[in-house]
């Protein structure tokens, strides 16, 4: 029988983070390392402030390397925060699902608000049925289904909105300075990598499985969020503001058929998450303004 997280008291839980050099992956590594035996992978950029012997260079196309890492680490829990080629990633998740099914280990899969990008008519909670039309959203939803089929209640799916570090926020400002338009009728929810990492640690300690949305308490238009960012960084500039149509929204997602988009009645597009998990909202709910002030 599989162990609950809290059963690992005498023996420290061994965690493997796939994608430990990314925004959320690196925050997870730093957050979890004090309490657990944490290992990570990276592709090009080795994570800062980590133990040299606990990270592995890994190209997701190389399955022999993945098998070697799994045999070396023998993880009780795998947290997937991978990026890269969708087909390769899907194969990686099939491989780790097979490994964890046999070892009775557990998995936390970091998913996205884009599993709902075909229905920008409202915000979506954990009980809503995904409807992706972008390749990215379709891939993430395929991974969710694959892992669920293999692991059932040994899987936690964590769906994330736009999740920022200080570096990410600065890049967004620079893109606007370089002329990238900001959409006034595109609404998003947000979070910070540090807050997400703390919430995931809470989920580990609470033996959580199923689906959770780790998101801000409020939603805000992309242009309003940019105004707050510019004010935070004391930038006084006029930027290009645009408005999505169904056609341009569909095109931005790489979809050729606007008829697939489920439109809202108010002309806005909501790529947002909400949560019905009151304990997570109570402990880790954060406003968009607080997100910016924490960067």
Regions found by a protein language model. Give the residues of each.
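N-terminal Rossmann NAD(P)H-binding glycine-rich loop of SDR-like oxidoreductase domains
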Residues: 13-35
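Conserved Rossmann-fold cofactor-binding substructure of NAD(P)-dependent oxidoreductases
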Residues: 57-74
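Catalytic helix-loop patch of NAD(P)-dependent Rossmann-fold dehydrogenases
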Residues: 115-158, 165
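NAD(P)-dependent short-chain dehydrogenase/reductase
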Residues: 145-195
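Amphipathic terminal alpha-helices
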Residues: 2-4, 264-295
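Mid/C-terminal beta-alpha module of Rossmann-like enzyme folds, strongest
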Residues: 199-250, 284-295
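N-terminal Rossmann-fold cofactor-binding loop
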Residues: 40-47, 60
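NAD(P)-cofactor binding segment of oxidoreductase domains
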Residues: 71, 76-108
């Amino acid at each position: 029988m599989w162990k609950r997280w809290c059963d690992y008291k005498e023996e420290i839980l061994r965690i493997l983070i796939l994608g430990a050099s990314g925004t959320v992956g690196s925050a997870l590594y730093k957050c979890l390392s004090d309490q657990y035996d944490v290992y990570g992978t990276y592709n090009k950029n080795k994570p800062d402030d980590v133990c040299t012997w606990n990270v592995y260079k890994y190209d997701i196309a190389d399955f022999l390397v993945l098998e070697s890492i799994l045999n070396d680490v023998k993880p009780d829990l795998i947290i997937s925060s991978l990026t890269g080629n969708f087909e390769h990633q899907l194969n990686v998740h099939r491989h780790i699902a097979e490994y964890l099914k046999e070892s009775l280990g557990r998995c936390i899969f970091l998913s996205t608000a884009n599993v709902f990008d075909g229905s920008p008519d409202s915000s979506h909670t954990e009980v809503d049925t995904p409807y992706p039309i972008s390749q990215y959203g379709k891939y993430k939803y395929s991974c969710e289904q694959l892992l669920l089929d293999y692991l059932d209640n040994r899987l936690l799916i964590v769906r994330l909105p736009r999740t920022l570090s200080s570096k990410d926020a600065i890049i967004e400002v620079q893109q606007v300075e370089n002329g990238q338009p900001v959409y006034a009728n595109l609404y998003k929810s947000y979070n910070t990598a540090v807050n997400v990492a703390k919430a995931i640690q809470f989920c580990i300690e609470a033996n959580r499985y199923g689906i959770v949305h780790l998101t801000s308490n409020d939603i805000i238009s992309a242009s309003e969020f940019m105004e707050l960012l510019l004010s935070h960084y004391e930038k006084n500039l006029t930027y290009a503001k645009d408005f999505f149509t169904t056609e341009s929204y569909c095109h931005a997602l790489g979809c050729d058929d606007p008829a697939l988009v489920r439109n809202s009645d108010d002309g806005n597009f909501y790529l947002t998450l909400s949560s019905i998990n009151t304990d997570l909202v109570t402990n880790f709910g954060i406003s968009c303004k607080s997100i910016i002030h924490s960067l």
